[in-house]
UniProtKB/Swiss-Prot annotation:
One GO cellular component term: mismatch repair complex
Pfam families, alphabetized: DNA_mis_repair, HATPase_c_3, MutL_C
Protein name stated in the entry: DNA mismatch repair protein MutL
GO function terms (MF aspect): ATP binding; ATP hydrolysis activity; ATP-dependent DNA damage sensor activity; mismatched DNA binding
Any Gene Ontology biological process: mismatch repair
SMART domains hit by this protein: DNA_mis_repair, MutL_C
This protein's UniProt keywords: DNA damage, DNA repair
Task of the protein: This protein is involved in the repair of mismatches in DNA. It is required for dam-dependent methyl-directed DNA mismatch repair. May act as a 'molecular matchmaker', a protein that promotes the formation of a stable complex between two or more DNA-binding proteins in an ATP-dependent manner without itself being part of a final effector complex.
NCBIfam families in UniProt: mutl, PRK00095.1-3
Alphabetized SUPFAM superfamilies for the sequence: ATPase domain of HSP90 chaperone/DNA topoisomerase II/histidine kinase, DNA mismatch repair protein MutL, Ribosomal protein S5 domain 2-like
InterPro entries: DNA_mismatch_repair_CS, DNA_mismatch_repair_MutL, DNA_mismatch_S5_2-like, HATPase_C_sf, MutL/Mlh/PMS, MutL/Mlh/Pms-like, MutL_C, MutL_C_dimsub
Family the entry assigns: Belongs to the DNA mismatch repair MutL/HexB family.
Length: 647
């Protein structure tokens, strides 16, 4: 007797369930996507014990005909594709015909559905076996309940996380679906407690406000672009609103949420030097394209896709974001604490709001004005640095009570800010006063961010603090400028242009530089020797696993030649290519940082004025090359609020 045998359907479904149904979040995703494909406009999701005990999905979609109910739970049975041509023109979220049989094989499932034209169907399935089928009275739509998930595969239960974690995975998926389909009203309940409710009015800003808070929604920049192959729409936050994880970026392709690293990377590249290292924006990007240009049949979970014209798409995303930011003044507001109802702000935003303004005001730190009066439009030139206040030798220290108060906040600060998307709640669902209509009104009242160019307005210096921060003013209020970051931006753009224009000339090293590598690294570098020659770096083999460098391109910054060479080697080993543009940019950043004014360096008023005027000539006067903010703004209104001049 042969050893190879065909597996029965039940065992096949159990195996398939291992890929399709990884955890309760997978069940919710598949069932909600089925509801959307069935043209539902309202979907309710009810959970018990994070879905491990019970998941119930109720929709008002097309429903399932009686004759299709049994067939729907057979493997690879679907109404969404018919032939090979349909597979490459998929517009629906589901198409594989694996979800329902996979879910039914590892749970106790109950289905009540009706098309509205005939009596409904009531179906009970346990572990893949049909227990009961009968006609029943039912409204149009589908009501499907999944209980005791993985009851017959206890090994899978061992890999489930805590209820808190599993619930977080579900809310994360539901949030993405809500962003993907703002035209569908979604309600999410856990143990009868409402966690999310979207109106289904098609306004994605309202969905984003429900998820991230109304304060974040006020900082959203609309993104829109179109090419022959792609249409892009979405929102991204201003550079001042960032998170420590990429998890806050959502990419949607033809209505389907996908996890695609290169798309997220393109969004980051669109910000370029506007973001600090290790910080990421909150973003939502919806991409529409011909289904022929995207392959969604990569993985059973359908979260991964491949693009036919990937480079064109990435370039469009980067250029669209960069163009949008060039139309905006990116000066972050410092903000002033005001009494607002907690329902208006998330915990995260309350913390940011309270701690964004300076915490240690001290009278001696204020530098005297430099001769400006109300009638003058230009500041008086004061050349004598003696007029600037000099700090005492002993630096002022805040009272110990303030220090203790700050320290007591630190542990909770990290836990609040660093949490992933699913932990961020924008409003308390039990607050009866906060209704969906109020959120709609607040979103409608949000003013569009002004797209009136990103030129820095004229700033008139009024002093310097700690030899580090410059104070300036204009008719819009007070500005605080980090002098090192400001000159770093000026120098960066100068060196970037200078390095970018340098011809491929080489310069001899006085002492050859030796590079020792592992065998794998050596082989990868050896493959790229010709590419390295094209950018002006000539390597000679020296021994078994080493190279020596006798010359380098003339644009290498003096004193950092070996650092740039090591960076090039690291690029070759990791990326298997040489990105000369990135190398030159890093060289420009390195040179600009070393050549800039340092902290605790006192400047004359003329030097300050010249620095601010030079900053205005840069293409991006708002962040240094590392993404840190250069200046912060206090509006006149905020200052009046501080001093209770307005209430």
């Amino acid at each position: 007797m042969g050893k190879i045998r065909k597996l029965d359907d039940q065992l096949s479904n159990l195996i398939a369930a291992g890929e399709v149904v990884e955890r309760p979040a997978s069940v919710v995703k598949e069932l909600v996507e089925n509801s959307i494909d069935a043209n539902s406009t309202s979907i309710e999701i009810h959970l018990e014990e994070a879905g491990l005990s019970k998941i119930r999905i109720i929709d008002n979609g097309d429903g399932i005909a009686e004759e299709d109910c049994i067939v729907a739970f057979e493997r690879h049975a679907t109404s969404k594709i018919k032939d090979e041509n349909d597979l490459f023109r998929i517009r629906t979220l589901g198409f594989r015909g694996e979800a329902l049989p996979s879910i039914a094989s590892v749970s106790e499932l109950e289905l009540i559905t009706s098309t509205g034209d005939a009596p409904g169907t009531h179906l009970i399935i346990k572990g893949g076996d049909i227990i009961k089928q009968e006609k029943t009275a039912s409204r149009k739509g589908t009501d499907i309940t999944v209980q005791n998930l993985f009851f017959n595969t206890p090994a899978r239960l061992k890999y489930m996380k805590t209820i808190h974690t599993e619930l977080g995975n579900i809310t994360d998926i539901v949030y993405r679906i809500a962003m993907s389909h703002p035209e569908v009203s979604l309600k999410l309940f856990h143990n009868e407690k409402k966690l999310l409710h979207t109106s289904g009015n098609g306004d994605v800003r309202q969905v984003l406000a429900s998820i991230y808070s109304i304060q974040v929604a006020k900082k959203l920049v609309p993104i829109e672009a179109e090419s022959l192959d792609f249409t892009i729409k979405g929102y991204v936050t201003l550079p001042e609103v960032t998170r420590a994880s990429r998890n806050y970026m959502s990419t949607i392709v033809n209505g389907r949420y996908v996890r695609n690293f290169v798309l997220m990377k393109a969004i980051q590249q669109g910000y370029h030097t506007l973001l600090p290292v290790g910080r990421y924006p909150i973003g939502f990007l919806s991409i529409e394209m011909d289904p022929m240009l995207v392959d969604v049949n990569v993985h059973p979970a359908k979260l991964e896709v491949r693009f036919s014209k990937e480079q064109e798409l990435l370039k469009l995303i980067e250029e669209t974001l960069q163009a949008a930011f060039k139309k905006i003044q990116l000066i972050p507001d410092a903000g002033v604490t005001t009494k607002k109802k907690e329902k208006d702000e998330s915990v995260q935003e309350q913390f940011k709001f309270e701690h964004a303004k300076p915490k240690e005001p001290s009278m001696p730190e204020i530098i005297l004005p430099t001769g400006m009066d109300e009638k003058q439009e230009e500041p008086l030139a004061v050349k004598q640095p003696a007029q600037l206040w000099q700090p005492p030798k002993q630096e002022w220290q805040p009272p110990q009570s303030l220090v203790r108060e700050e320290q007591s906040w630190q542990p909770s600060t990290k836990s609040i800010i660093e949490e992933p998307i699913r932990e961020e709640k924008s409003w308390d669902s039990n607050d009866e006063d906060f209704e969906l209509e109020e959120l709609e009104e607040e979103v409608q009242e949000i003013k569009e961010i002004e797209m009136n160019g990103n030129d820095l307005p004229p700033l008139y210096p009024i002093g310097q603090m700690h030899g580090t921060y410059i104070f300036a003013q204009n008719d819009k209020g007070l500005y605080m400028i980090d002098q090192h970051a400001a000159q770093e931006r000026i120098n960066y753009e100068y060196f970037r242009d200078k390095v970018g224009r340098v011809a491929q000339e080489v310069q001899e090293l006085l002492v050859p530089y030796r590079i020792d590598l592992s065998l794998t690294e050596f082989l990868r570098v050896e493959e790229q020797l010709e590419e390295l020659k094209k950018v002006g770096l000539f390597l000679e083999q020296f021994g078994h696993q080493s190279f020596i460098v006798r010359s380098h391109p003339t644009w290498f910054p003096k004193g950092q030649e070996t650092e740039i060479i090591d960076e090039m080697m690291e690029q070759v080993v990791k990326l298997k290519k040489v990105d000369i543009k990135k190398l030159r940019e890093e060289a420009a950043i390195m040179m600009s940082c070393k050549a800039s004014i340092k902290a605790n360096q006192y400047l004359t008023n003329d030097q300050i004025f010249a620095l601010l005027e030079e900053l205005r000539t840069t293409t991006n006067p708002y962040t240094c090359p590392h993404g840190r903010p250069i200046l912060v703004h206090h509006s006149t209104y905020e200052l009046e609020k501080m001093f209770k001049r307005v209430m």
